[in-house]
Amino acid sequence: AQYYADLRDPRFAVSFAVYHRRFSTNTLPRWPLAQPMRLLGHNGEINTLLGNLNWAKASEAGLEDVWGEAAADLIPVVNPDFSDSANLDATLELMVRSGRSITDSLITLVPEAFRNQPDLDSRPDVTAMYEFNAGIQEPWDGPALLVFADGKRVGATLDRNGLRPARWCTTADGFVIMGSETGVVDLSGKTVVEKGRLGPGQMVAVDLERG
């Protein structure tokens, strides 16, 4: 924080913050690939990346239906020279800028395991939503813990493999903290009212506009 003058200014205040630090495991470190990206911070790998890139490339022709002539400025949406995280971020941003909420977009891109899922037997509407989304978007499968923010919502979601740690808590004075481990934020003097961990396919999100 000492490097950035705005962060040292006592007048500087925000309603949320996303912080990510991780060694690159499958690409060479480069500033354009530094995280968090425009909408995402990603801990993990996308093991379906090749199929996802091919699907995205094949779908580019449909961009004109939403964006008209401006679609030419968006192509290519994905780039095989970029990291898996950067390509997922670009795909998510396209969906969000096209009018879908960031939470709905992530549920589509990174769905939970909904087939033969006993917990969803009483929620046919949820199963129907996932089945509909599966027809228009192939899943980006991890292992992946994704932290997201678009200025309207901030949160985190775990892919259906559930192989990345994600712990959260809320405090009596209104803070919501989520991290890959406890202790990321000093909670000395604060009263924790609820805490837990994300399971496979689960999401925690805060609506910054409505509270």
Predicted regions located by residue number:
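Conserved short alpha-helical segments that host acidic/polar catalytic motifs at enzyme active sites
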Residues: A1-G211
